[in-house]
Structure formats: C-alpha cells, structure tokens
C-alpha cells in the first residue's frame, strides 16, 4: 500500500469517528424521544400489540436467532426451521391439540369415551397424521405440513357451554403475504371450524397453477377389542355435490378419483374424522390401505383440490367433525353424515331408520339398562308380528292334519312319477282349501325384521361400553374361553351368549320338527343351520346374540301357547267339510294357479 492510499484511508476513518461523536444526541434529546415512544406504545390496543408481537416479531426473532442460515433459504425460508409447540383447543366434547409445525391438528381426544384398553379415546395422534396445502412457487414444491406457523396465542383455550373461541396460526412469506389457518370451536359441539385464508399469494403461487391441493393422511389406531371386525367396518366415505354418499371398499385396499365433493370422512367402526368444505372441493382422490400392523386399523389418504383465484385474498371455509358415529348426532350435523352408518339395504334399511331406531330411542328415554331396552324392544316386535306367527302356525297345523292323506297318495302313486304326485297333492290342497305356502309366507314377511337387526345392533353406538349381566360390553363379543386362532374356521374364543342363542335355536328346531312331523333331509337341515349361525355370530356383538336368544325364546313360548289353543280334530273337521263343497265354489290361490300351469307345461314336455 503506497503512502497516498494509507493517508486517504486514515482520513476517512477519522471523519467517520468524528461524525459519530459530534452527531450523538444530547441526554435531553434522548429523554424527549423516549417519552414520545412511550406515548405511542400506550395508544396501541392490546390486540394490535399481540398481533404484531406474535405474528411478525416472532418471525423476525427467529431469523435473527442462531439457527443455521443455510436452512432458511428459498421460499418460506424463515418458516422451515423452528421448535414444535402445541396449543390445545377444547370443550366438553373434544380436545384438539394443534401443532405449530404444519399448523395442523396433531391429535384429537373424544372426551368421556375410552378405548378397549380403558385409556382415553384418541382418534389419531403423532406424526403419522399429516395435513397441509401443496403448491409450487419459484420452481419449488411447497407443503405447509413441513413448515412452522406462528400461533396468535400459545395459551390453551377451554370453551364453556355457551361460548366460542378461535385460534389463528400464520405462515408468513413476506410482508402482507401469508397463509392463515383459523380454528374455531363452540362449547357444545363435535365440530372444529377450520378456515384457510391466503393473503397476497397471487404472485407467489406459480402462474400455471389454478388450485391448492389439500393433502390429509392419517393412520388410525385400534379402538375396539376385535381388530378384524373394526377393519371390516372402517373405510373412507364421501358425498358428491349431487348428494350421492358413497364409500370405498371395507374388505380390501381401494382408491377412487372424485369430482366435486362436499365432504370426505375417514371412518372407523364407532368414530369418524370428517372434513367438510362449505363451498365444496373441486376435485380429489381418496385411498384406503390396510397395514401389516397390530396397532393401526387402516391408513387413509386424501388429496382434495381447492380452486385458487388470482386475487389478493382467498377464503376457504371448512369444518372438521371429530366424534362418534351416533345416528342422531351425525344427523344433526347435516349433509347426510348419518349415511355412513350401515343400516342395511332395501327394506331392512327403512325398517331400521323409521321403525327400529325411533322405538329404541323412545325406550332409551326411560334411562333403563340397555339389556332391558333390548328385552322390551324384542317383546314389542313379537307382539306386532304375532298375527303373522299365528297364521303361519295354523297353516302348519293344516298341513300336519293332511299328512296322513298325503302319505296315502305317495304310496298309491309312487315317488317315481313326481309330476303325477304333485298333481295329486294339488288336487288334495284344492279340495281341502289349504295353501301349502300359507306357513311360509308369514315367515318370509318376518324375515326383513330379523335381518334388519343383523345390521342394527353391530352399528349401534349406544351399546358401546354398556354392560348387562356378565356381558361387559354389548357392542362386542362376550368371550368366556380364549385360545389361539384355529385355521379354516378362524375363531379364537367362545362367546357365551352365542352358545345360549345356538342352544335355544336347537331346542326350538327340535320342538318344531316334533310338531310338524318333519322327516328326511328337512329334519336334519333344521339342526344344521343353528350350528352354522354359531360360527358366523360367535364374533358378533353380544347385544345381537342376546336379541336373537330372546327372539327365539319368545317365539318358542308363543308357538307353544298357539299349539295348545289349536285343536287338530277341529281343523280336520273343517278340512273335511271343505272337501264336500262344490269345486266351482272354491277359489284357487295364486300358488295353486301357478302350480297347475306348471304341471300342464310339464305334461306337454313329457308328451313330446
């Protein structure tokens, strides 16, 4: 360095040092400036100070911290690092823990409910649940699930019955450019309001993109005792904008592309996680996968599109439903959420929705034990169906009285010529005025009610955790013996109520065979069916087997008293009197007409 350069640098340093010294404000000027700043600070409202401190200063403080600056480069660089914190938003129904990482709901506890181990019931928890907006900017793919949001408040919020509260988390991009997640909760609700607001993002989101993709993934843990049954009743549901509610497969891995959609649901047996879009999702996709895990029931994934408009502010109002699959509660939410509950198909669905469920809810109002409610429900059903039972039994009595004459016809005609044998039987039925299907039709009319309960009780949330007698939980099986899984038949326990139901059915079958005089294959089929039902129903809820046990017992008692009131000799006399009536005065039943037409067709075929 030459002398001139050294002299120039020295003079510059002297000038800078002198300017700092001579331009320093006096103590009086410093005091006046401090008073002015204090006055301005006092005029700021607490909300303005909180907003400024929590949503902007915190971000600036983060950037000034000792975090490695190389991690904070690129779009949303200041939000790529941070420490995860949880803010709790709860009421008397649910407790939602909201994470600053991703601004997502990290876990939800349904208050007042327990899992099969007796622990507080948590719908989902931990990092196995992901939730975020996906888009690209400046050639970089962004997923807000991986970024850190700034909470409006870090204090937990407990909402009382009549109150409501909200929590805002902000993801800053730059000044006046951010994404807000706003959660809101009312005092008595299973719904957690959720609104996404984008501010100044029209120049941030890549010009080629017209949507934000909302990605939601969850691995839902086991909550019920029977993992296999819970898996078979867990899947994803959705409602399209045309009002059609549909589901993915419950028994295998499945996926589906969706059009405009109102809501999606990650449904387990007795609880659902629903995301409702007030303005609908423009498109989307759902996927359900069964993992090889002893703790996770199923893995759910959804990618739902939110239309993005090139404007300063976009708002996407939504809501979560985190709660039980109880028909009345789901129906109160609107949007057909109750259609997630499998009430059966065809007439069984209508029986359960408009007869069984209203009567059950009426009995529930008496605050009886649920075992007693099922008992009363069974009695009421038997009273309503008793006319059909009586008619069926009278028809069976007529066939029993005719059996000796039918045996004579069989001996006379022989069993080789079945066509002629059936013709002779029809002639006898016509003369006696007996409809051979008269005993079957009333029983067939009762079958929809029997099948309806097969769907009703296994999906009835009200039975969950309710005990009766030795049954600790009416919503699952009551095992008295447990053992390793037996291949082929796939059972690892014995249900006491299922045994009682099977025994009652076998006794009823024996009595009916004795009364009706059943012989041959029909006699043994009657004993075979209850054994099949045992293996089918052994893992079904104790409440269902309890109902079938009561139903079989009451049917047996009713049949016994009807049998005592029916006089076979009187019926025989009526049949003989009917035989003496002229043929023209006897009206043929539709069954007899069809059988006669069938016989004539058979005769024509045989002649050819």
Predicted feature descriptions by range:
Residues 42, 58-59, 65, 110, ...:
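Intrinsic disorder/low-complexity segments
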């Amino acid at each position: 360095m030459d002398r001139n350069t050294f002299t120039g640098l020295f003079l510059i340093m002297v000038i800078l040092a002198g300017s700092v010294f001579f331009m320093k404000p006096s103590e009086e000027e410093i005091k006046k400036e401090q008073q002015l700043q204090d006055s301005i600070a006092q005029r700021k409202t607490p909300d303005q100070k909180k907003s400024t401190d929590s949503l902007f200063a915190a971000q600036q403080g983060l950037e000034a911290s000792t975090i490695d600056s190389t991690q904070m480069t690129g779009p949303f660089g200041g939000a790529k690092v941070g420490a995860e914190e949880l803010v709790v938003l709860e009421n008397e129904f649910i407790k939602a823990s909201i994470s600053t990482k991703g601004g997502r709901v990290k876990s939800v506890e349904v208050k007042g409910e327990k899992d099969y181990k007796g622990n507080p019931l948590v719908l989902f928890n931990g990092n196995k649940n992901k939730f975020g907006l996906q888009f690209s900017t400046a050639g970089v793919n962004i997923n807000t699930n991986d970024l850190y949001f700034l909470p409006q408040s870090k204090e937990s919020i407990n909402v009382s019955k009549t109150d409501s509260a909200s929590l805002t988390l902000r993801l800053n991009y730059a000044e006046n450019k951010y994404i807000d997640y706003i959660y809101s909760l009312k005092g008595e609700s299973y719904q957690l309001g959720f609104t996404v607001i984008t501010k100044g993002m029209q120049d941030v989101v890549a010009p080629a993109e017209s949507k934000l993709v909302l990605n939601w993934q969850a691995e839902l843990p086991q909550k019920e005792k029977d993992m296999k049954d819970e898996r078979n009743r867990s899947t994803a549901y959705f409602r399209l904008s045309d009002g059609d509610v549909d589901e993915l497969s419950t028994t295998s891995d499945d996926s589906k592309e969706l059009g405009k959609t109102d809501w999606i649901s990650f449904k387990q047996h007795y609880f659902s996680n629903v995301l409702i879009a007030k303005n609908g999702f423009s498109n989307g996709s759902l996927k359900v996968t069964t993992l090889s895990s002893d703790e996770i029931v199923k893995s759910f994934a959804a990618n739902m599109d939110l239309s993005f408009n090139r404007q300063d502010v976009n708002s996407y109002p939504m809501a979560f439903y985190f709660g039980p699959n109880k028909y009345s509660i789901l129906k109160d939410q609107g949007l057909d959420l109750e259609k997630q509950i499998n009430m059966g198909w065809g007439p069984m669905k209508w029986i359960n929705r408009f007869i069984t469920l209203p009567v059950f809810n009426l009995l529930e109002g008496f605050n009886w034990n649920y075992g007693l409610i099922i008992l009363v429900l069974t009695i009421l059903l038997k009273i309503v169906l008793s006319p059909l039972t009586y008619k069926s039994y009278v028809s069976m009595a007529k066939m029993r009285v005719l059996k000796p004459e039918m045996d004579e016809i069989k001996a006379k005609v022989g069993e080789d010529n079945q066509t002629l044998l059936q013709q002779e039987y029809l002639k006898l039925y016509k003369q006696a005025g007996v409809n051979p299907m008269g005993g079957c039709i009333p029983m067939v009319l009762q079958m929809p009610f029997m099948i309806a309960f097969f769907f009703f009780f296994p999906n009835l949330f009200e039975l969950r955790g309710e005990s009766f007698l030795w049954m600790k939980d009416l919503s699952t099986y009551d095992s008295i013996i447990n053992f390793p899984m037996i291949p082929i038949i796939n059972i690892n326990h014995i249900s006491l109520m299922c045994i009682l139901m099977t025994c009652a059915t076998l006794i009823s079958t024996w009595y009916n065979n004795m009364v009706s005089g059943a012989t041959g294959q029909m006699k043994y089929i009657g004993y075979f069916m209850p054994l099949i039902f045992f293996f089918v129903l052994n893992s079904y809820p104790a409440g269902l087997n309890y109902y079938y046990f009561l139903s079989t017992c009451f049917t047996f008692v009713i049949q016994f008293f009807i049998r005592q009131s029916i006089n076979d000799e009187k019926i025989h006399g009526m049949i003989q009197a009917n035989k003496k009536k002229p043929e023209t005065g006897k009206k043929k039943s539709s069954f007899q007409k069809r059988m006669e037409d069938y016989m004539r067709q058979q005769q024509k075929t045989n002649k050819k």
